[in-house]
Amino acid sequence: MTQRLHALLHSVGLPVPQGLSDAVIESITCDSRCVGPGSVFIGLPGGRVDGGSFWPKALVDGASAVLIGSAAAATLPPEQSDAVLVVPDPVARWAGELAAAFWNHPSERIGLIGVTGTNGKTTTTHLIEHLSSACGRPSALFGTLLNRWPGHSVTATHTTAVADRLQAQLAEAYAAGAQLTAMEVSSHALDQHRVAGCRFSGAVFTNLTQDHLDYHETMASYFEAKARLFAPPLVADQGAQFVVNIDDPWGKHLAERLGDRCWRSSLSEGSAHAELTMSDLVMGSSGVEGRLLSPLGEGSFQSPLLGRFNVMNLLQAVGVLLQQGLPLEALLEAISTFRGVPGRMERVVVDGKGGELPTVLVDYAHTPDGLSSALNACRPFADGKLICVFGCGGDRDRGKRSQMAAIAAELADAVVVTSDNPRTEDPQQILNDVVEGIPSGTALTVMLDRAEAIAGAIKDAGSHDLVLIAGKGHEDYQILGTQKVHFDDREQALKALQDKLIF
């Protein structure tokens, strides 16, 4: 892929400096280490270093043009270079728009569906990908766990990639034959303009509960960051349609803002204002069955997924795909073949020994609402005690620690508080913060070492008990200080179950 520089700049509304050569552009990058002849380098401001300060090096390395912000220009004025453009803030917006133009606007050709919310993004996007592919429409997936499309799969490093890389990946997915893309869109990605240049033809709002207030400071600010997904310039055009969970108060507020452009989803009894609902729901240890009702018809379904929150994920995934023109009957049939997402209510088992051992589930629940939903989902399957093992991450919203503690104490029969990803905080102080939220009289164990906490909880559990290990889910690492060390809750749980059989 190549483009002429002048046409590229004009296409996104940037002026062309008089002395700027109309070079052939071969790459768009925000990484100064990737600059070479034919590159356009966009210097993004960062928390520690302003990438715009690397403009002299980028020119030395052969960049045809460099885009920087006002702060970098004030620190290191590019007065003698026509190849350096000082663009209006936010600079990240231009990275996305320019990369999208360079790659011929892949999001407008691939049926891009964004999913945002505090909880449920990963399962909902995986559902969208699975259901679409099962209905004969090859799909791509961009999310927390991985990025994949036909012939390609790679572990994701961020929920949403930086704009230049994201546009390149969308182009790769389209070239590989993907006709629809499901993308997790985090509030950080929206606030930092990582999805600039994308045009979404559909979007889903799952819910909004306390998280990331270390970054957004207030719930109102957090909500407005999420709401950007449903407004210009990110929506494709007036034809874009949305699915919004109105059982969530923030979702109800968003639905009122969007009006008839959204289908409202609800599992509440007698919700007369929802276009997407369920009826005749029966939940059991083997999953859920019921009827799905939509503006385009209704039908029965069966799913192996556990928990009421997963029913909402199903409802929203089907709804947004109906809006994209997929047939209801085929979607309902495909639901039964979706087996779930790694680390989301994932059962850890020793083959052939199910009746002798406690039920152990690993889940990513790391917010107050997520933990509440997971524990409520577990309760019907705990014939004995419900035991909750959890911790809270360091260098993150401290306000949710006591809330999660209170929820665990209320909904579980026994609570084991342990370390999560302490990062640069004192792990013991994090535990102290959590324990402060647990009322006296709670069956409480505090154990700093997460492996020992998991092993102890499973060792003490009876065959009719259920152990929920919450917080890390799919993660195969623990962040201690600034280092990642290998750690997988599922591996630790399996070892503990095997040891229980031996001893």
UniProtKB/Swiss-Prot annotation:
Meso-2,6-diaminopimelate binds at residues 396, 420-423, 471, 475. It is found in: Cytoplasm. Its cofactor is Mg(2+). It comes from the Bacteria. Gene3D superfamilies: Mur ligase, C-terminal domain, Mur-like, catalytic domain, MurE/MurF, N-terminal domain. One of its GO terms (biological process) is regulation of cell shape. The modification N6-carboxylysine is found at residue 226. Its EC number is 6.3.2.13. A motif (Meso-diaminopimelate recognition motif) lies at residues 420-423. It catalyses: UDP-N-acetyl-alpha-D-muramoyl-L-alanyl-D-glutamate + meso-2,6-diaminopimelate + ATP = UDP-N-acetyl-alpha-D-muramoyl-L-alanyl-gamma-D-glutamyl-meso-2,6-diaminopimelate + ADP + phosphate + H(+). ATP binds at residues 117-123. One of its GO terms (molecular function) is ATP binding. UDP-N-acetyl-alpha-D-muramoyl-L-alanyl-D-glutamate binds at residues 32, 159-160, 186, 192, 194. Carboxylation is probably crucial for Mg(2+) binding and, consequently, for the gamma-phosphate positioning of ATP. Belongs to the MurCDEF family. MurE subfamily. Catalyzes the addition of meso-diaminopimelic acid to the nucleotide precursor UDP-N-acetylmuramoyl-L-alanyl-D-glutamate (UMAG) in the biosynthesis of bacterial cell-wall peptidoglycan. This is UDP-N-acetylmuramoyl-L-alanyl-D-glutamate--2,6-diaminopimelate ligase. The gene is murE.
